[in-house]
Amino acid sequence: MKPFTTDQQSPAGSPESAAFDAVPGDGTTAPAKGRYARILELAGPAFFSVAFLARLPLAMLTIGALTLVTSITGSYAQGGFAAGAVGIGSAVGGPALGYLADRIGQRPVLLGAAVANPLLIIGTILTAAQLPGGGPLAAVLAAAFGMGATGPQVGPLARVRWMAMTSKDRTGKELGTALSYESMADELSFVLGPALVGLLAAAVAPWLPLALAAVLSASMVSAFAFHRSAAVVLPAPRRTKNTLPEPEDTVQRGGTSWGLLALPVLGMVAMGTFFGATQASLAAFGGTFGAADAAGLLYSIMGISSAVAALSVAFWPRRFSQSARWAVSAAAMTAAALLLLLPSGIPGMLAVLFLLGIPVGPTMVSIFGIGAELAPRHLMGTFMTLLASGTVAGTAVGSGLAGPLAEAFGHPAAFLVSAGAAASLLVLGIASAAAVRRAKNQTA
């Protein structure tokens, strides 16, 4: 693999064609090879392991807070509030971290998060430990908010790096493959994260998952910050002013309205609401069998099928547009989510969750793909973190809605929140398809 250089312009075909000066390689055409082999060559093997481990803490924080507080207090509602505080913090802090990364570079922002986030995780554990003795829930919620606000935004910032590393490919296939991989990595992290929370909480102690998240945040996020791919993305003041034509199937960014940009953000909020409601509902479902701590393990089954399906999106035909993929996948999600109301035992629930995961991955890939096409170049990091924060904020909404419903009426009522969130995704997907088509017609 050739070293990264800093003297090249980004060609057309990349959502970041005018935003980056540093891209890999020397301008020669790469030999034909498998799509995933090509992105492995672009980033280097270490990128994948480091970036995956670095994103695990964010996948553990919400359900870790839910599990910790629920285990200590016995209240699904209080656990849902703690998870909600994490999500709200991430909704506020995530885009702020992305904006800072756009302005001053990814490395200093990630290193700051690698210091602050572990400290606030420890604060959450310590304040939660005081709850049985009459400690204030407000202190736990404040610490959880800070924990979410400083959560390392590894997934979104990795996507920004990919937009630079694949900027020579005019076909967009390399970026599409990279985004499919990133969605798969996100899904696997949200499989392994909750699974680790469930295993460690059930086998050792409910505080241990968050303690592990603190260790990973301090170590692996720092490693991601120092990975050489960080040099690919230059801060906004140092970016080139040159612009090149967009791919023919991309909406012109200069004419992209904020209303159109809001659709993928709202889509990720709905996706997060689906995730949060499903997590909280599964905790209540497991509780009927005396296994509330196993919610993460149950949830991980959906993530496995979702991750595999996300990888397949790289091979879908390009004429099947991102907006159409979103609408079709969300329709399948809505139908499958209604099946959550049927199982009366764990084997049946596992089967439904596996089926439900199949359209989840492609929906996420499609929404991020639309975001990559539409986002302003100089705010790409901000917009990618905004999408990811939408997921976490939605998780807070879903947990906050489903937790009290589960406590008052049982898990079937809580699963209705999951089904409603999937239906919202369908509506937003249809709206996005219509809006993107209208925008393309106006700029044609």
Go through each PLM region and give its residues:
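Helix-loop boundary and gating motifs at the non-cytosolic
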Residues: G25-A91, V251, G255-S300
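Intracellular juxtamembrane helix-capping segments at the cytosolic ends
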Residues: A65, P152-K168, L282, P362-A375
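Loop-to-transmembrane helix entry/capping segments in MFS-fold secondary transporters
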Residues: Y76-A77, D169-S183, A292-D293, R377-L387
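Helix-to-loop junctions at the C-terminal end of transmembrane segments
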Residues: G93-Q106, A201, V308-S323, A406
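C-terminal ends and interior cores of transmembrane alpha-helices
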Residues: V115-G135, A225, A332-S344
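Cytoplasmic helix-loop-helix junction between adjacent transmembrane helices
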Residues: A143-L188
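C-terminal transmembrane helical hairpin of 12-TM major facilitator-type secondary transporters
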Residues: A324-I367
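A late C-terminal transmembrane helix in Major Facilitator Superfamily
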Residues: H378-F409
